[in-house]
């Protein structure tokens, strides 16, 4: 299995260890290794692509406290989360750690991230997408098919009957 860090990031051990912690949080909450790896690969890509936007945000606010992580997550993932918001949230946190020379996210932050994933993301990924599943278009096919077949048979019998009576 390929290691999580890209070669240019291996110099930044704090960034690499933060990504590893995120990877473990996702796996411990029921994500498969391949899905967790895809999420973190996308997180790294988006972190690089959006670094200019993240720089503007990080200049205007300080690194989030554990309680503010919960508030941010509630606003991002309510009423319903989606993958783009999850990746953007993780990419911003990874960007903050990558550009910092000290550890930003301590055990309190990681516990809060575990709680966020468990409360907001896991129910969304494991639960049904729609509480009332849509009916497939061919669920009622047998009854409609039988009705149309019977109607066509009756019509055929009537046509045959009238044709035979007209020829007599």
Curated annotation (Swiss-Prot):
Compartment annotation: Host membrane
Bilayer-spanning residue ranges: 143-162
Topology of the protein relative to the lipid bilayer: Single-pass membrane protein
Alphabetically ordered keywords of this record: Host membrane, Host-virus interaction, Inhibition of host apoptosis by viral BCL2-like protein, Membrane, Modulation of host cell apoptosis by virus, Transmembrane, Transmembrane helix
UniProt GO BP: regulation of apoptotic process; symbiont-mediated suppression of host apoptosis
Listed InterPro entries: Bcl-2-like_sf
GO cellular component: host cell membrane; membrane
Function: Suppresses apoptosis in host cell and thus facilitates production of progeny virions.
Name of the protein: Putative apoptosis regulator A9
